[in-house]
A protein has these predicted regions:
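Extracytoplasmic "Venus flytrap"
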Residues: 34-55, 77-84, 106-107, 173-181, ...
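Segments of small-molecule ligand-sensing domains
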Residues: 302-312, 323-394, 412
Length: 414
């Protein structure tokens, strides 16, 4: 039986001072979260949705008695997509604000620096947006927990999704940093395993936050692959799609976007989002049709006048992971919480369904959804439909890979 099916059997604007600006101090007895996301520039929507989700989650939790009868508070700051800014924020959170948990960031590149900071300071970092698989793989340490499906999981799910389709000649157009490369490498490796007949005909890695994609669009048109794996996200995905539309690229080549099912892409594209593009998103507000998700979407829309993006869904889930982990451990003390989380898998319910924290690599186990874009008159933008679910057991680390992660960590730790 699937773990994701069997786990169903496991049984004012702000309430109080639950959500704080950087000029307000935490109260002494609260459970404290220091969160960092990109909240400015063309990727700023990621931080905005994260902030709103944290507000909503904390209000719910505190209205229900908090965590261990303690109020929960958070500060949310802007990393500006800069490592030094993020590290300074983390240092302030730990040394001055005395937070119990760090949360974020958006960029995997910044997360690589923050995870080392968390290890050195023995402070738990909850990853809710950064997705490079190395964060719970080659860079694993016990103080990091990832509550969203990482690049490896999404890439493997994409390989399963595409393996049943007739395409043979593949190439990649992805951002030139850790996430883009790991996303492609994992997709390619799993697809070649499932479909030995596929052929890789090109790999293109434009600079992150590129403004002009003409060179890369022309190369795809010249090579004319059957399909393109394209892990561009946010404003980069919007710019690429917008610039490619006049060329008819999406009628000539099937594009597969592992994160373009995000509202950060679909809403600004509006009617211009091409139909028939394969997309995934770690959470999409129309699925699942559960009471929890319906309530979350309704409350979020009522409060913020917009639908929750995947950053909202995943960050909301991250806050509730902290609640579940603290309640199991009966403490916020990092080492005791880690020990409790590693005794057995920890399951908690979220708007996107049940999530399970793997006690070995601290990665979430969950299904991944894929769909195909089509314009929706009700919402005024394209949404994915005809969802296909790839089960979590198929896309997470194997028993051998999990063992290798801990063995490698033990070597580094000793």
């Amino acid at each position: 039986m699937s773990i994701l099916k069997s786990k169903k059997m496991i049984g004012a604007l702000i309430v109080g001072i639950a959500f704080l600006s950087s000029t307000v101090a935490f109260s002494a007895e609260s459970v404290k979260i220091g969160a960092m996301f990109i909240s400015s520039g063309k990727m700023g929507g990621y931080g905005k949705h994260a902030r709103q989700a944290i507000q909503l989650a904390l209000d719910e939790i505190n209205a229900d008695g908090g965590i261990l009868n303690r109020n929960v508070e958070a500060m949310v700051e802007d990393t500006e997509l800069k490592k030094d800014v993020a590290l300074n924020l983390a240092r302030r959170f730990v040394e001055q604000d005395r937070v119990d948990f760090l949360m974020g960031p958006t960029s995997s590149g910044i997360a690589m620096a923050l995870t080392e900071f968390a290890r050195q300071n023995k402070k738990i970092l909850v990853l809710t947006q950064a997705a490079a698989d190395a964060l719970t793989g080659s860079k694993f340490h016990p103080y990091v927990f990832s509550t969203l499906s990482n690049a490896m999981m999404h890439s493997r799910s994409g390989a399963y999704f595409m393996a049943a389709k007739p395409y043979k000649r593949y190439m990649c157009v992805g951002p030139d940093y850790s996430y883009g490369h790991s996303s492609w490498n994992m997709f390619k490796s799993k697809l070649e395993q499932l479909r030995p007949d596929v052929e890789v005909v090109g790999e293109l890695f434009p600079k992150f936050l590129s403004k002009d994609y003409t060179e890369f669009i022309n190369k795809v048109l010249a090579i004319r692959p059957d399909a393109v794996w394209c892990p561009l996200w946010g404003g980069d995905a919007v710019n690429f799609i917008t610039q490619a539309l006049p060329t008819g690229l999406f009628e000539k080549v099937k594009f597969v976007f592992p994160v373009a099912g995000a509202l950060e892409v679909l809403v600004p594209m509006g009617r211009n989002m091409p139909s028939g593009v394969y997309v995934s998103s770690r959470y999409f507000f129309t699925s699942p049709d559960s009471s929890l998700n319906r309530r979350f979407v309704k409350d979020y829309y009522t409060r913020f006048n917009e639908y929750p993006d995947y950053m909202a869904g995943e960050t909301y889930a991250g806050v509730y992971f902290i609640k579940a982990a603290v309640e199991r451990a009966a403490t916020t003390e990092a080492d005791k919480l880690i020990a409790a989380a590693e005794k057995e898998p920890l399951a908690w319910e979220t708007p996107e369904g049940w999530k399970v924290m793997n006690p070995v690599d601290h990665s979430v186990v969950e299904d991944c959804l894929w769909g195909e874009t089509s314009y929706n008159q009700k919402y005024g933008f394209a949404i994915p439909g005809s969802f296909e679910s790839i089960q979590g057991e198929e896309i997470g680390r194997t028993a051998e890979e999990l063992k290798a992660v801990r063995m490698e960590y033990d070597k580094r730790a000793n």
